[in-house]
Amino acid sequence: IMDITKFDELKNGVQEIIDFIGNKNAKDANNKLVEVSEELDELLDHTDEDEELREISKFQVLLNQLQQKIISLQ
């Protein structure tokens, strides 16, 4: 069974990153990105369910895109 709350936390973290980017706040956006990435790695270490792995890989793609945006802000 997928741990929905964990993914909700990740979604909230991603939303915070997006808000920081919207406010041109590269420093906080980057710090939050590191935090969310670590949470994602943690999840990855503790799952072997296909559904969760698919969800995690979506977040990884999203975080990579956000990282590019943060870099372009700096």
Please give the residue ranges for each predicted region.
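N-terminal acidic leader/helix
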Residues: 1-32
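Short, charge-rich amphipathic interface segments used for partner binding and complex assembly
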Residues: 32-68
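Charged low-complexity stretches with an acidic bias
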Residues: 3-10, 18, 53-74
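Secondary-structure edge/capping motif, primarily at the C-terminal ends of alpha-helices
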Residues: 14-25, 43-47, 70-74
